[in-house]
Amino acid sequence: MQRARLSRYGLLSVTGPDARAFLHAQLTNDIEHLAPDRWALAGWCSAKGRLLASFLVIASPQGFLLQLARDLAEPVAKRLGMFVLRAKVKIADEIGRAHV
C-alpha cells in the first residue's frame, strides 16, 4: 500500500476516559453522538464567540483525531490543554506519525 504525507495538515490526538465529554464541551459540533470511524467538521471558539480554529474531528475507539492546518496544531494543542483541568484527557501532536 502506498502512503502519502499530509504535509499541509496537523493532527492532534485527544484520548482518555473524558475525551468525548471534553471535546463536546469545547467544540461547535455534537461530539457526544459521533460514532467510531465517523468524522465531523467542528470549530473551536473563544469566549467571545470568535473562531480560533476549524478542523475535522475523527472518532476512533481510542479517542479522537483533530485534523487542522499544520501551523495551528501546536498553538491549539497548547491552548486546549489549558482547559483540561481535572478531566482525564491527553492531547498529543501526531504530526510525525500520520500517513494516508
Where in the sequence are the language-model features?
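Basic, glycine/lysine-rich polyanion-binding surfaces/domains
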Residues: M1-H99
